[in-house]
Design a protein with these regions (language model features):
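Nucleotide-sugar donor-binding/catalytic module of glycosyltransferases
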Residues: 1-117
C-alpha cells in the first residue's frame, strides 16, 4: 500500500460517550494506518474522557483535548486543526463511522487526480 503521508483526523465531540467507541474503532480499522486522531471535546457533560482514555493508552495516535469552555462546533474544530500535524485533514464526527477502506480510497483518488482534502 502507498504511503500518502500523515492524515490528521479531527473528531469534535460533545456528550457522545455512548457512540465514540464505535467511531474510534472505525478509524483503527482503516486499511490506511498513517493517521492521528485528534478528539476535541467541547466540555462534555458526560463521561466522554473516561470512555476515550483506554483507547489513548493503547494507541498513541489517539489524542484528546478539551476546550476551556463550551464554544460550539466551529471553535472546537479550529482548536483541533491547530494541533494537527498531518499533510491531510479529515473530519469525522463522534457519532459517525467510516468504512474500513475510506481513507485508502479517498487518498488514492485525491493524489491521482490532484485534489486536496
Amino acid at each position: 500500500m502507498d504511503d500518502y503521508g500523515l492524515v490528521s483526523i479531527i473528531t469534535p465531540t460533545w456528550a457522545c460517550a455512548p457512540f465514540i467507541c464505535e467511531t474510534i474503532r472505525s478509524i483503527q480499522a482503516q486499511t490506511y494506518q498513517n493517521w492521528e486522531l485528534l478528539i476535541q471535546d467541547d466540555c462534555s457533560t458526560d463521561n466522554t474522557l473516561e470512555v476515550v482514555r483506554p483507547y489513548m493508552e493503547m494507541d498513541s495516535r489517539i489524542k484528546y483535548e478539551c476546550n476551556p469552555t463550551n464554544s460550539g462546533a466551529a471553535v472546537t474544530r479550529n482548536n483541533a486543526l491547530r494541533r494537527a500535524k498531518g499533510r491531510w485533514i479529515a473530519f469525522l464526527d463522534s457519532d459517525d463511522l467510516w468504512m474500513p477502506e475510506k481513507l485508502e480510497h479517498q487518498l488514492k483518488f485525491m493524489v491521482e487526480n490532484g485534489y486536496a482534502f
